[in-house]
Amino acid sequence: MTKEKNVILTARDIVVEFDVRDKVLTAIRGVSLELVEGEVLALVGESGSGKSVLTKTFTGMLEENGRIAQGSIDYRGQDLTALSSHKDWEQIRGAKIATIFQDPMTSLDPIKTIGSQITEVIVKHQGKTAKEAKELAIDYMNKVGIPDADRRFNEYPFQYSGGMRQRIVIAIALACRPDVLICDEPTTALDVTIQAQIIDLLKSLQNEYHFTTIFITHDLGVVASIADKVAVMYAGEIVEYGTVEEVFYDPRHPYTWSLLSSLPQLADDKGDLYSIPGTPPSLYTDLKGDAFALRSDYAMQIDFEQKAPQFSVSETHWAKTWLLHEDAPKVEKPAVIANLHDKIREKMGFAHLAD
């Protein structure tokens, strides 16, 4: 018998609003998702699609002008939307759900040594003595690839490179022993070579510690190399969801087609790369129909009038597009992403997607 997958976090119909200059900006519009224990879920989409805002609702880190206006978030039987005080969130934030941010310098205290910042977390979350915490901290530093960790334990953040600082942030997250690790664009500020190293490190640690991961990115190349499931976000909604193989090889929403078409590895022989026309809609307005319709070559009249429901493609794959309605005209996805399986094998080398 196959082991039944354990859903550890369930978000239902989440709406997040921000008060901005006497207006209301709706950043998340009715998002629902389930997080399965041990899996890596990638949240992908353009900047402003709501990826980071959504995960902030899981850790109580919305800005002061933001609020969850609707919906529920169940984490292992606990309603996170009922938490209000900093003390309430202390039991969840870091201890159960930890976050690695894009810029490691926003996570590190510049006037404290690296070692003191790691040991502080170990003492708080693991209840170790100072001596035990130092030994563990050096062990974590070694695990994340810090050379000469014994000596560098007493150095300050400014003495570390950007890539090494990000490794320290990962070490601090590990020291919390989280159940869920949110990686919010953790490689964006790093050069390509260091990005690959950090991704490999996260994959290795995920395999060793078996924590559940939410990986936020706009880079589908990263998604292909690390994710089990993919949620494609646009204008505060999830418009397509499936396994990484389903989203890459059998995408159904026109926005997903556009994202895949813009993969740098799919540039033509002249080096020309597809870019999505237009700009995302204003989130201050009440969006009617499919928010992507104005930018889509495949939009039908109904896309401008009614929001599409979830159409199931398989037990694990769905998309919100009227193109999946039984009466919709049959259209072909863009030629550039046709036979994507072969192109991935030939040009992109994502091992777990190439089979």
Curated annotation (Swiss-Prot):
GO terms for biological process: peptide transport; protein transport; transmembrane transport. SUPFAM superfamilies: P-loop containing nucleoside triphosphate hydrolases. SMART domains: AAA. Part of the binding-protein-dependent transport system for oligopeptides. Probably responsible for energy coupling to the transport system. It comes from Streptococcus pneumoniae (strain ATCC BAA-255 / R6). Keywords: ATP-binding, Cell membrane, Membrane, Nucleotide-binding, Peptide transport, Protein transport, Transport. Residues 9-260 form the ABC transporter domain. InterPro entries: AAA+_ATPase, ABC_Ni/Peptide_Import, ABC_transporter-like_ATP-bd, ABC_transporter-like_CS, Oligopep_ABC_C, P-loop_NTPase. ATP binds at G45, E46, S47, G48, S49, G50, K51, S52. The lineage of its organism: Bacteria, Bacillati, Bacillota, Bacilli, Lactobacillales. This is Oligopeptide transport ATP-binding protein AmiE. It is found in: Cell membrane. It is a peripheral membrane protein. One of its GO terms (molecular function) is ATP binding. GO terms for cellular component: plasma membrane. Belongs to the ABC transporter superfamily. It holds the Pfam family oligo_HPY.
